[in-house]
Amino acid sequence: MRRGDIRTVAGGKDYAGKARPVVILQDDSFDATASVTVCAFTTDGTDAPLFRLAVEPNARNGLRVPCRLMVDKVTTVSKSKVGAHIGRLDDEDVLRINQAVLVFLGLAASPRIKQEA
């Protein structure tokens, strides 16, 4: 299980409660932990570009339909809840989620929102 991998997760809480694809967010350096931090996908087409990142299906990522990564729903689940390997995010999508997580957590300024002086 590596950062950027797309896997299935089922049996988590709230938004990861039903089986759905997730991307592994946690750095590979922390693979000895019993849990893993993930970001779930949804097929809901809500347009919220700062925290719902559109990802189109392709051969590398293994997604079957257009999805959105729910950056506002990052969660940590037990590794025992992580299922099948689906694919892997493209490098460009990994960079997009990196930036989106930083902005959502307030660790970086959004390129789309003007900061007040």
Which residues fall in each region the model found?
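Conserved functional hotspots at enzyme active or ligand-binding sites that engage polyanionic ligands
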Residues: 1-117
